[in-house]
Amino acid sequence: MEYFDAHCHLNCEPLLEQHEKSLANFRLIGLKANVVGTNLTNSQIAVNLAKQHPDLLKAGVGIHPNDVQLFDLKAAQATLKKLVSTHRSFISCIGEYGFDYHYTKDYITQQEQFFLMQFQLAEQYQLVHMLHVRDVHERIYEVLKRLKPKQPVVFHCFSEDTNTALKLLTLREVGLKVYFSIPGIVTFKNAKNLQAALSVIPTELLLSETDSPYLAPVPFRGKTNWPECVVHTVQTIADIKQVPLAEIKQAIVHNAKKLFW
């Protein structure tokens, strides 16, 4: 393994239709990835892909906070639990799940309920918490400090500033295993806050991701993103941290193996 994409959506269009072509590129560059679900349907697809390509992919199963209103809590819990218990060896994380107050706060109660349900599932099956957190980092800090997860926590698509990074890092002081997954946003010229935050995040806590098909890094910004584009994100991380590319690649792969593989 030369590269790792901690969070992609090969289980969603337009990537799903062409996933075999993308996986050929995985082999060319030494890439492996987590294919992450956002609802029950594409979580099952993620598992199917991981089963078909166990040398390249692991699955994440979960319900995105912006979709919680579409599901019955108990039914979703039963479906996810069956999925995990049946296919545990192909699954690396629960998620993406979390909190998102960016578009609406109409579903805060449901987000809280689905958060706790998926949190408990990750703890029960000893899986990584793949967290989606948008416009609510103070809340996630309080919740994690109270719940004290024993399993590692990954802040997916981390794109916040230095103060937020430093505060979340203090969770390690109370025994939490937190990691930061850096998206292609870090390659954007206007991502100064994230670039500054990267300087305070220890290399041993870093992961790289694409969140493809979204958030394509420079030089593909504005186009469809693909997991193999993670190479540009990793290069930028190395440039910002002013360390050799080989060192960053090795560190990220080491972290990925420890958490997911």
Swiss-Prot record:
GO molecular function: DNA nuclease activity; metal ion binding
Keywords: Hydrolase, Metal-binding
SUPFAM superfamilies cross-referenced by the UniProt entry: Metallo-dependent hydrolases (SSF51556)
Known EC number: 3.1.-.-
InterPro entries in the cross-refs: DNase_TatD-rel_CS (IPR018228), Metal_Hydrolase (IPR032466), TatD-like (IPR001130), TatD/YcfH-like (IPR015991)
Binding site for a divalent metal cation 1: H7, H9, E96, D211
Presence of keyword Nucleotide-binding: no
Gene3D superfamilies recorded: Metal-dependent hydrolases (3.20.20.140)
Cofactor dependence: a divalent metal cation
One of the record's GO cellular component terms: cytosol
Binding site for a divalent metal cation 2: E96, H132, H156
Note describing how the cofactor binds: Binds 2 divalent metal cations per subunit.
Family statement drawn from the similarity comment of this UniProt entry: Belongs to the metallo-dependent hydrolases superfamily. TatD-type hydrolase family.
Protein name: Uncharacterized metal-dependent hydrolase MPN_009
Organism: Mycoplasma pneumoniae (strain ATCC 29342 / M129 / Subtype 1)
